[in-house]
Design a protein with these regions (language model features):
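A residue-level marker of the well-folded mature domains of exported/periplasmic proteins
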Residues: 1-292
């Protein structure tokens, strides 16, 4: 009873370090965190943007520890470099929720994310089916120093193994639309026969589409992305720019729900895996199809 009364009226401060706000998906994550936190008047979130810098993000986590926040939420830029500062915060007694990109080891309170390998595998399976098991594919990877980039690639490669799907051009577009467009321009110059583009996120798929459209080849190429934001991937799909996208939840509301429990002394799972959906032109109006 004493423990419960001690939390009544208490103000909680959460430090949130976002690796970058240059990606629309991450802007939406912060918006979802803010919206979910607004339901709890005792919660205050301090948002920080690491501006795509590992050093800045490491410093931000250290600042949160020094300022004595009650809980830290981190969406890491890269896996290995963020492991140490997150572990230090955790060992200092501050709960840490890691979103989207995993870190090494288990020195954190909770990880929340969807299964990127399963999403990549589902995308690969759809690609094999759509191309009838053979064709030339351009793969535009996400940052391969991050777990989502690695896992979306791994799942895709698992699905196409043993088929006649040939990845004729691969590039790390670092989640950025402009880099994806530039890489696709190179692929189009080198290869006259491209059947499909598999991009690790929707901005990458859209960047590839723009490159192909500029040279009159977009109608002959299938474009596949990941994220499935209503304002982005689903809009691209509805307008015919891309052909399929796989939803990766922003984790925002789930993070706040977990944070609230943790701050009140309740246990949460070490890993919370969120569900995903596949969207195509055929099922968009029906809300997509859940992944198995």
């Amino acid at each position: 009873m004493a423990g419960k009364s001690a939390t009544v009226g208490k103000k909680w401060v959460i430090g949130m370090s976002q690796c970058t706000l240059a990606e629309p998906w991450r802007v939406q994550m912060d918006a979802d965190l803010k919206k979910a936190a607004a339901k709890y008047p005792n919660l205050k979130i301090i948002f920080k943007d690491a501006q795509n810098s590992v050093l800045k993000q490491r410093a931000q986590i250290a600042e949160f520890v020094q300022s004595g926040v009650n809980l830290i939420i981190v969406s890491p830029k890269e896996t290995a470099p963020l492991t140490e500062p997150i572990a230090k915060a955790y060992k200092a007694g501050i709960p840490v929720i890691v979103l989207d990109r995993a870190v090494l080891g288990n020195q954190y309170t909770c990880f929340i994310g969807a299964n990127n390998t399963a999403i990549g595998r589902a995308a690969g399976t759809w690609i094999v089916h759509t191309l009838h098991g053979k064709g030339n594919v351009v793969e535009l990877e996400g940052s391969m120093t991050s777990s989502p980039g690695q896992e979306r690639n791994a799942g895709f490669q698992q699905a196409i193994k043993g088929t006649q799907i040939h990845v004729i051009y691969t590039a790390d577009m670092k989640w950025q639309q402009n880099i994806a467009r530039r890489e696709m321009e190179s692929a189009l110059t080198r290869f006259p026969d491209i059947n499909l583009v598999y991009a690790a996120n929707d901005p990458g798929a859209y960047g590839a589409y723009l490159a192909a459209k500029a040279v009159g080849r977009a109608k002959k190429i299938i474009f596949v992305g990941i994220d499935g934001l209503p304002s982005e991937g689903l809009a691209y799909l509805a307008q015919g720019y891309i052909d399929a996208t796989f939803r990766y939840p922003t984790c925002g509301r789930h993070a706040i729900a977990a944070a609230w429990k943790i701050l009140h002394g309740k246990k949460v799972p070490k890993h919370i895996t969120l569900s995903s959906r596949m969207f195509t032109k055929a099922n968009l109006k029906d809300g997509g199809q859940p992944l198995p």
